[in-house]
């Protein structure tokens, strides 16, 4: 079975670990979000790609869900002693090595997709991890801080400001001019199932869909497309997805996120059992819906979510 997954960071990575447990023999291609990418200290940092790579490769800080296990921060402390910022983004020593290798390879002329493949040679994540594009795309958020309206990088909004001010707009800068990375459209065309994990629908999955040709390829793939709600009981399972949903005019409910994706894209949608009351609303929107437990409390819970998603895909296929 060929499965394509559009993934952001922590939620996407943990779902993928469950998917690998549920169907160990499946051929899984992950299209990773690069809208979170940021340049720090002259290095290109790809938080979502790295979170997927580290999680599936066994090097993730399990407690945080991001960054490396057994991490130290000597380099960060030395940079701070020189007054070199920013100090709000916690890059560890082991993590720095990844970004140095990536930046060196990009400087030598390799595209991000080839660099990501090379990095995965070390981590052996057991999936094919492709960035959504080799072009530079950065998600920016329009905010008002101290009476001044300005655009900040998504990482600054998320990490430094902790989404403490309303997001007035969310824009994937550069997306309109970008092209899907090599292998992205081919993977979608060859897929048996396409899954949207419980990643952020605006700044993770939404950014991938903003790359010209990706949304159209998924809509026209002719195979089941099933998503899992990142909203449980009208609140994000983790993170601050409600803040960026508000910026695009979507209420923070499982049903509203399904409607945001739309029946032209989604065939099936899983909501948590606490949101069973919204199943009818989703089905009225033309999307087959089931209520199942959606809390990834451990690996088996994530694996069961993946099984439910694949079961719904087969239900859609047989309809």
Name each model-derived stretch.
Residues 238-319:
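C-terminal functional extensions of proteins
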Residues 32-172:
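Electropositive, gly/pro-rich neighborhoods at or near active sites that engage anionic ligands
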Residues 29-33, 224-231, 267-273:
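Short internal beta-strands
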Residues 16-20, 204-217, 279, 283:
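Short Gly/Thr/Asp-enriched flexible loops that form oxyanion-binding sites at enzyme active sites
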Residues 1-4:
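Extreme N-terminal starter segment of soluble prokaryotic enzymes
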Residues 24-26, 221-225, 266, 287:
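A short helix->loop->beta-strand "cap" motif at the edges of active sites that frequently abuts
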Residues 209-248:
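Redox- and metal-dependent alpha/beta enzyme cores, enriched for Fe-S-associated oxidoreductases
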Residues 168-187:
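Active-site glycine-rich loop that binds ribose-phosphate moieties when present
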């Amino acid at each position: 079975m060929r499965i394509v997954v559009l993934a952001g960071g922590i939620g996407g990575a943990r779902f993928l670990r469950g998917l690998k447990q549920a169907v160990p023999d499946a051929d899984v291609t992950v299209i990773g979000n690069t809208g979170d990418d940021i340049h720090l200290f002259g290095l290109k940092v790809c938080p979502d790609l790295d979170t997927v790579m580290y999680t599936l490769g066994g090097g993730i800080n399990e407690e945080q869900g991001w960054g490396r296990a057994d991490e130290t921060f000597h380099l960060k402390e030395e940079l701070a002693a020189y007054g070199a910022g920013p100090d709000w983004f916690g890059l560890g020593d082991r993590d720095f090595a990844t970004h140095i290798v990536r930046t060196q390879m990009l400087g030598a002329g390799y595209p991000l997709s080839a660099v990501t493949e090379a990095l995965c040679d070390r981590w052996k994540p057991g999936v094919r991890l492709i960035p959504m594009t080799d072009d530079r795309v950065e998600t920016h958020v329009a905010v008002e801080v101290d009476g001044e309206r300005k655009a900040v990088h998504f990482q600054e909004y998320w990490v430094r400001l902790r989404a403490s001010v309303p997001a007035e707009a969310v824009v994937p800068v550069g997306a309109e001019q970008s092209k899907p990375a090599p292998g992205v459209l081919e993977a979608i065309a060859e897929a048996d199932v396409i899954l949207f994990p419980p990643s952020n629908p605006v700044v993770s999955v939404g950014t991938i869909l903003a790359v010209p040709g990706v949304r159209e390829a998924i809509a026209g793939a002719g195979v089941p497309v099933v998503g899992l709600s990142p909203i449980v009981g009208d609140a994000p399972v983790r993170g601050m997805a409600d803040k960026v949903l508000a910026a695009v005019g979507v209420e923070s409910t499982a049903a509203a996120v399904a409607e945001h994706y739309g029946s032209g894209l989604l065939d099936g949608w899983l909501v948590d059992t606490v949101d069973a009351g919204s199943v009818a609303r989703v089905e009225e929107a033309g999307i087959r819906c089931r209520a199942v437990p959606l809390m990834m409390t451990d690996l088996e819970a994530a694996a069961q979510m993946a099984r439910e998603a694949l079961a719904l895909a087969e239900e859609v296929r047989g309809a």
